[in-house]
Amino acid sequence: MAELHLRGWLVSGDGVAIQPVKGRSWGDVIAEEVAKFLNGTWSDYGLGGMCAVHPHCRLRIWYSDFDGTLEEVMEQFDMKLYGGKVESEYHQTGYSEYTSTGIDVDNFTIGGHDLEMELSSHIGEFCHFILETDIE
């Protein structure tokens, strides 16, 4: 399985999860990275748009209030889930997963779920966006 792992802060305004790109939303930047990963291409639909749909994907999104490695965020999530407290400092974490569904980069959806809306509900949080697919 091939994997795309994007990480960064979700911020409002011109900020993006990957890198600052003036005048573009972070949703557009993430969608473009996904299109590149899926070997998608830009198509001219008049206003422009990406043409990349892949039927077999697994998307995991981890959220936290700190800039940590995926392992650190997963550990904090487990502590939250099971009520254990290994460290004295606690961080808020969250997790979403979409499996066996197709991703549509043009509309930035997976299995009919609007990813920009999903990510928008986590503005101000750190995000690990992990897309796995069966492409070679």
Feature locations, PLM:
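Short intrinsically disordered terminal tails
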Residues: M1-L4, K36, L47, E75, ...
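Short, extreme N-terminal segment that most often corresponds to the first beta-strand
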Residues: M1-Q19
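Disulfide-bonded cysteine-rich modules in secreted/extracellular proteins
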Residues: L4-L10, M79-S96
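Beta-strand elements of well-folded, non-transmembrane domains
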Residues: L10-D14, Y63-D67, S88-Y90, N107, ...
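A short, exposed loop/beta-hairpin motif centered on an aromatic-Gly-Thr core
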Residues: I18-V21, D106
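Alpha-helix boundary/N-cap detector
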Residues: V21-V29, S64-G68
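Acidic, low-complexity, intrinsically disordered interaction modules
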Residues: N39-M79, Y90-I123
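Short conserved beta-strand and strand-loop elements enriched in small hydrophobics
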Residues: C127-F129
